[in-house]
Amino acid sequence: MSRRRASRALLSATLLLAAAAGACGYSLRGNLPDHLKTVSVPVFRNRTTEAGAESTITAAVVNAFTSSGRLKVVSLEDADSVLDGEITGYQVQSLTYDSKLNLRSYRLTVTMNVRFRDLRRTEILWQQEGLVAEVSFDVAGQVSDTISREEGAVKQAALEIGRKIVGHAVDRF
């Protein structure tokens, strides 16, 4: 086959492949099953000693679903689907030190197991064990200021978890 024919054949094959891919219905929005319109997000179980983390993380996940606009958050009785889970890890570890070996920052790591279920068809649509969010925060002069920064880090980790969960549960279909 001549070089010119080979180029035309390659171009034709590429165009055919592109047209076929375009007809596959690929969308950046995802293809959540049509019958799913609502989701319930019960308060996550907290298997750690960090009191209150479950409320902060659950609220962030509810807000992430609400912001996405893909599923309306409702009570369990009215839901087509449910996102449930548990917080399995909450660790604060030393991260950086200054030249005098004074602690300068921490890393907060929150670990969860989550599951997204279709209640109408009684099937698990997505689940993940060991979903992790990590946030660093600086040490402040006063202990109370450092605690306040840790609380802010928990909120940031919760936002990250919310984005990850909605990304997996809704946008990856």
Stretches with model-predicted labels:
Residues 1-23:
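Sec-dependent bacterial lipoprotein signal peptides
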Residues 4, 32, 102-104:
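Short, surface-exposed loop and linker segments with low hydrophobicity and enrichment for Pro/Ser/Thr
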Residues 6-7, 41, 84:
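Intrinsically disordered, low-complexity Ser/Thr/Pro-rich tracts
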Residues 13, 146, 158:
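Residue-level marker of regulatory loop/turn positions in helix-turn-helix DNA-binding domains and
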Residues 23-63, 67-79, 92, 120, ...:
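A structural "domain/chain start" motif
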Residues 28, 67-71, 82-128, 135-152:
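Surface-exposed short loop/turn segments
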Residues 49, 53, 104, 149, ...:
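Conserved acidic
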